[in-house]
Amino acid sequence: MEGWQRAFVLHGRPWSETSLLLDLFSEQHGRVRVLAKGARAKRSSLKGALQPFTPLLVRWSGRGEVKTLRSAEPVSLALPLSGTTLYCGLYVNELLSRVLQHETAFSELFFDYLNCIQTLAADPPSPEPALRRFELSMLGHLGYGVDFLHCAGSGEEIADGMTYSYREEKGFIASLVTGHRSFTGRQLRALSTREFPDADTLRAAKRFTRIALKPWLGGKPLKSSELFRQFLPRKPANAAPADEE
């Protein structure tokens, strides 16, 4: 790769006594796996810099699936996530690691990710709106296009007072039966704008993203959610990471 580009570390693990194997989310190449040789050595200039939520400029080389990190410079200090927001940030990182293919460019999603992490770092009253917006954005970039404003059965515009059932690969169908896949027209309008004025629309957004993300995640649970449940006190529903039910 020629030149520098912006990136964040999604995940890292030791590789030999002195090196790190990293998953990066880069602006121009999407998710890239790199080997940071010597990054764990005592005198390494990279020691402490290759951490999640630290904005980086990076360069790498290589043609295989695992590249060699040539240079990395922090643009600023790590964005200050702690407590609940830290676990939410780890959730977002794990989500990207699980669903993005290697070296597929998602430049717009990179900036949506940056906006999400910056919002979490500002310690909002609830992290849920930022998480729901990011999930919906990611689904859109992955090609999961859903029309929230029209009934898939009739083509008519969604009506606020009606109930609709979600069906994969089709959309929302008017229904008299309510269930886990049922949404009101008002909730669907909130999903279309990614604005959630109250707890009802926020819960509906969470329910929809759980349904939509399930095929991407399969049956394997997210480690970040398990960590949240183990190490943080129980919070109200609106304060939990995205895949908490």
From Swiss-Prot:
SUPFAM superfamilies: ArfGap/RecO-like zinc finger, Nucleic acid-binding proteins. GO terms for biological process: DNA recombination; double-strand break repair. InterPro entries: ARFGAP/RecO, DNA_rep/recomb_RecO_N, NA-bd_OB-fold, RecO, RecO_C. It comes from the Bacteria. Transmembrane segments: none annotated. One of its GO terms (cellular component) is bacterial nucleoid. Pfam families: RecO_C, RecO_N. Involved in DNA repair and RecF pathway recombination. This is DNA repair protein RecO. It comes from Erwinia tasmaniensis (strain DSM 17950 / CFBP 7177 / CIP 109463 / NCPPB 4357 / Et1/99). The lineage of its organism: Bacteria, Pseudomonadati, Pseudomonadota, Gammaproteobacteria, Enterobacterales.
